[in-house]
């Protein structure tokens, strides 16, 4: 079931906090930047994972290694424990990033990431997402993303956090 909450996602008591990340090892804006600042371990583990995928791509793909690294990472998730009873989920939903109004979120990757969440998060746990995850910075359509979350995670208590400004 989906619940909407006015408040700061980073103050949630949910078991899991899920946000979208790019495959370039950058957490320089939006929710990702806030998570990076509050829990540096999340960025450290994310950056290390991105570096290892990029090293693999450079070793095995002479042509367009960055593209190969991104395509290998899209749709995956990374779980990083930030408290005894709380884990941040990095959902690799966009290959690159930009600030030009284009859509960087891959709907296929986002959907696959939600499937990965179902595999590694036991039913009965609570999952928090930022309002318009993948939309504000990633350019996706919220109606599509919201429908995906509702369909994929219908067995979970999902909380959508909207930060009042």
Segment roles from a protein language model:
Residues 1-165:
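Macrodomain-like recognition of ADP-ribose-binding/processing modules
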């Amino acid at each position: 079931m989906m619940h909407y909450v006015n408040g700061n996602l980073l103050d949630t008591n949910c078991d899991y906090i899920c946000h979208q990340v790019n495959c370039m090892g950058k957490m320089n804006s939006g929710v990702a930047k806030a998570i990076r600042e509050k829990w540096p371990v999340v960025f450290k583990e994310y950056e290390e994972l991105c570096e290892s995928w990029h090293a693999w791509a450079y070793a095995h793909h002479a042509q367009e290694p960055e593209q190969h690294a991104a395509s290998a990472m899209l749709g995956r998730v990374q779980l990083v424990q930030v408290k005894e009873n709380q884990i941040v989920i990095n959902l690799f939903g966009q290959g690159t990033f930009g600030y030009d109004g284009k859509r960087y979120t891959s709907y296929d990757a986002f959907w696959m990431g939600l499937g990965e969440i179902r595999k590694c998060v036991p039913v009965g746990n609570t999952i928090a997402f930022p309002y318009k995850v993948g939309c504000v910075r990633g350019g996706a359509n919220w109606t599509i993303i919201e429908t995906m979350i509702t369909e994929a995670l219908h067995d979970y208590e999902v909380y959508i956090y909207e930060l009042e400004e």
